[in-house]
């Protein structure tokens, strides 16, 4: 009698667990389908359109692993940031030149409805893509060592192999006219063929409340796109879309100057870092 009761309870529990697992998988698939539906515009030709199409297949990528509801939310936010950022980059209309350096580094900008003014850095680097990926992703927390505009970056939480929650403390800028800011962001990293995309946007993380004496700013949909120069795999084209709400009261002229200058300085500091720091065996 006891044995029969045990078997009955065990069978019911097993069916319940199977049903729960199935429901979680259905939820994951629903998220993937919703992201696919929200993708900006129709699939477009070229490498950027290919990345957008493939990155929307979230459901099938997550089926094998179960995440908490909060983790799924962060993964979804990262995917949405990537879709929005790539959608902005893919629209070639309306870009205006902010500055251009003698070495060819260029910053463009435009106003995007619902987002605000965004900045686009175009850089060609004499380094293979895997080397950039190593420095920008694998060594992310070391960025404060070579980029004086960043005091510190910490990974607060890692979710799977593609998603992280980070806290970034930025230095004061424009002769201290812009005081120190910090950012809490969800970041998503994907590789599609020969292209790597590093995307992110602001998020809420309860374990990192606002800090005293620092203004909590927010990243809008932001991304870096890395892909080898056609015919020269030892060189990499880097495109950085920057969207930031610095918060506080600041004249637009100062904001525009600070953000475009930040991108130019980033390219310069990154080059020096790549030339002076040895590469490891990291691969994108």
Curated annotation (Swiss-Prot):
The residue span given for the transit peptide is 1-62
Keywords, ordered alphabetically = Lipid transport, Lipid-binding, Mitochondrion, Phosphoprotein, Steroidogenesis, Transit peptide, Transport
Q: Name one GO molecular function term.
A: cholesterol transfer activity
Q: In which pathway does it act?
A: Steroid metabolism; cholesterol metabolism
Q: Name all START domain ranges.
A: 66-279
What catalytic activity does the UniProt entry give for this protein?
cholesterol(in) = cholesterol(out)
Q: Choose any GO biological process term that the UniProt entry carries and state it.
A: response to herbicide
Q: Which residues carry this modification: Phosphoserine?
A: 56, 194
Q: Does the keyword Cell membrane apply?
A: no
- Tell me the superkingdom of the source: Eukaryota
Matching entries from InterPro entries are given as: StAR, StAR-like, START-like_dom_sf, START_lipid-bd_dom
Compartment list:
Mitochondrion
Fetch the SUPFAM superfamilies from UniProt: Bet v1-like
Q: Name one GO cellular component term.
A: mitochondrion
- Which proteins does it associate with, and in what oligomeric form? May interact with TSPO.
Primary role? Plays a key role in steroid hormone synthesis by enhancing the metabolism of cholesterol into pregnenolone. Mediates the transfer of cholesterol from the outer mitochondrial membrane to the inner mitochondrial membrane where it is cleaved to pregnenolone.
**Name by which UniProt lists this protein:** Steroidogenic acute regulatory protein, mitochondrial
Source lineage:
Eukaryota, Metazoa, Chordata, Craniata, Vertebrata
Gene this protein is translated from? Star
């Amino acid at each position: 009698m006891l044995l029969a009761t045990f078997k009955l309870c065990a069978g019911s529990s097993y069916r319940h667990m199977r049903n729960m697992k199935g429901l979680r998988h259905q939820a994951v698939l629903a998220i993937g389908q919703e992201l696919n539906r929200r993708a900006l515009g129709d699939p477009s030709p070229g490498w950027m359109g290919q990345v957008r199409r493939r990155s929307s297949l979230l459901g099938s990528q997550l089926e094998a692993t179960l995440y908490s509801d909060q983790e799924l939310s962060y993964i979804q936010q990262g995917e949405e940031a990537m879709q929005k950022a790539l959608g902005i980059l893919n629209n070639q209309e309306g870009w205006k030149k902010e500055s251009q350096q003698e070495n060819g580094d260029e910053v463009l900008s435009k106003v995007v409805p619902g987002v605000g003014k965004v900045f686009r850095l175009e850089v060609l680097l004499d380094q293979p893509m895997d080397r950039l990926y190593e420095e920008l992703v694998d060594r992310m927390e070391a960025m404060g060592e070579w980029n004086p505009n960043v005091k510190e970056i910490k990974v607060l939480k890692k979710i799977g192999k593609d998603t992280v929650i980070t806290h970034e403390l930025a230095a004061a800028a424009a002769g201290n006219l812009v005081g120190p800011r910090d950012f809490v962001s969800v970041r998503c990293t994907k590789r599609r063929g020969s292209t790597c995309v590093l995307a992110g946007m602001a998020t809420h993380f309860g374990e990192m409340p606002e800090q005293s004496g620092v203004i909590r700013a927010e990243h809008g949909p932001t991304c870096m796109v890395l892909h080898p120069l056609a015919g020269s795999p030892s060189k990499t084209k880097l495109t950085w879309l920057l969207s930031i709400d610095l918060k506080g009261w600041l004249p637009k002229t100062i904001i525009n100057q600070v953000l475009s200058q930040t991108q130019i300085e980033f390219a310069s500091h990154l080059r020096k870092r790549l030339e002076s720091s040895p590469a490891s065996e990291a691969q994108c």
